[in-house]
């Protein structure tokens, strides 16, 4: 399929052919969600923990005699129903990770890229060379693509991200810049618009079409 390649001034430079097996697939939200859940699960530290009756500090003495007080019988001040007692069925330290096959992870990335292209939210530019590391310069250029604090931009460069572009982008809210090897479904779907250089698009083609 043919797509237009722009420069950062939003001028059309040329048209290129992109592999439809990477950029023109049917939308599969189920697979995209599976991989996003996998990404977020790997981020969780899993250090949440509560104390059971055995972990609570305190006496093991019976609080009062079994019969004759008129109260409900109690065996321990550390029981779950007592104030300051243990927690029943609370969270424990564990890993939230689960396995997703590499093939499915690659498919999810292709589906995410295809979806953004289908809704005209994937922009291919010739390069990210802005000639300056000033944030104001980059912000004025991106305004031509309707960038604002409320519309996130996810920029994908080839192996080596342009240094000036990277430095200028650091102070911009809701704008992330990565090399193409770091492209992932979560960031693509999270941001409103995806901007990818032509060389990065070709590298993604080679990596994902295998």
From Swiss-Prot:
InterPro entries: Ribosomal_uL4, Ribosomal_uL4-like, Ribosomal_uL4_dom_sf
Pfam families: Ribosomal_L4 (PF00573)
GO BP field: translation
GO MF term list: rRNA binding; structural constituent of ribosome
Keyword Transcription regulation part of the UniProt annotation: no
Top-level division of the source organism's lineage: Bacteria
Alphabetized UniProt keyword annotations: Ribonucleoprotein, Ribosomal protein, RNA-binding, rRNA-binding
Coiled coil regions in record: none
One annotated Gene Ontology cellular component of this protein: ribonucleoprotein complex
Recorded family membership: Belongs to the universal ribosomal protein uL4 family.
Subunit annotation: Part of the 50S ribosomal subunit.
Physiological role: One of the primary rRNA binding proteins, this protein initially binds near the 5'-end of the 23S rRNA. It is important during the early stages of 50S assembly. It makes multiple contacts with different domains of the 23S rRNA in the assembled 50S subunit and ribosome. Forms part of the polypeptide exit tunnel.
Name assigned to this protein: Large ribosomal subunit protein uL4
Provenance organism: Orientia tsutsugamushi (strain Boryong)
């Amino acid at each position: 399929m043919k797509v237009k390649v722009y420069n950062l001034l939003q001028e059309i430079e040329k048209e290129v052919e992109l592999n439809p097996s990477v950029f023109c697939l049917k939308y599969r939200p189920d697979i995209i969600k599976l991989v996003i859940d996998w990404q977020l699960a790997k981020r969780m530290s899993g250090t949440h923990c509560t104390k059971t009756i055995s972990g609570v500090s305190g006496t093991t003495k019976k609080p009062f005699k079994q019969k004759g007080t008129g109260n409900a019988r109690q065996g321990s001040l550390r029981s779950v129903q007592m104030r300051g007692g243990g927690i029943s069925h609370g969270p424990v330290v564990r890993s939230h990770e689960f396995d997703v096959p590499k093939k499915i992870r690659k498919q999810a990335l292709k589906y995410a890229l295809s979806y953004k292209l289908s809704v005209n939210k994937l922009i291919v530019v010739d390069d990210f060379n802005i000639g300056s590391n000033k944030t104001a310069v980059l912000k004025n250029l991106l305004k031509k693509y309707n960038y604002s604090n409320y519309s996130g931009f996810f920029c994908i460069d080839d192996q080596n991200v342009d240094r000036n572009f990277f430095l200028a982008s650091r102070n911009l809210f809701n704008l992330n810049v990565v090399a193409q090897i770091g492209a992932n479904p979560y960031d693509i779907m999270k941001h409103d618009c995806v901007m990818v250089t032509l060389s990065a698009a070709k590298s993604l083609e080679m990596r994902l079409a295998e």
